[in-house]
Amino acid sequence: NIGTAYFGCGGFASDGSRVFDPDLFEENSQYAKMIEIKLSQGAKPGHGGLLPKEKITKEIADARNLPWPVLHDCVSPARHSAFSNPYELCEFINTLRTLSKGKPIGMKLCMGHPEEFAALVRAFVETGEAPD
């Protein structure tokens, strides 16, 4: 599954933030049966999640593509950096589908406002790009 920190399919930008890496995603997608995009999964609304560095083992660091030894807490941002609106999400879905050679794309989401879900559906209909 793909969350905001892009573990297993991302790396670090020059400012230290986590970003999606298409090459790493394509390489690792061969081991997946499907792709799941996680939306609105921050541990605290608007703040994302935090894994203290003391709890990060070598195995966790390897799985999350973090440098070892880990010197900083691992932060999952509140929002995705690969897209910022429903139409860009549709483009991201198309990118994932292409890079994974047609694997099914799903979404896991939690919405606080019905209009947010309506905006997603409207973008899916208008672009023809949607989860499977």
Language model features with spans:
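Active-site entrance/lid segments in N-terminal catalytic domains of soluble metabolic enzymes
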Residues: 1-132
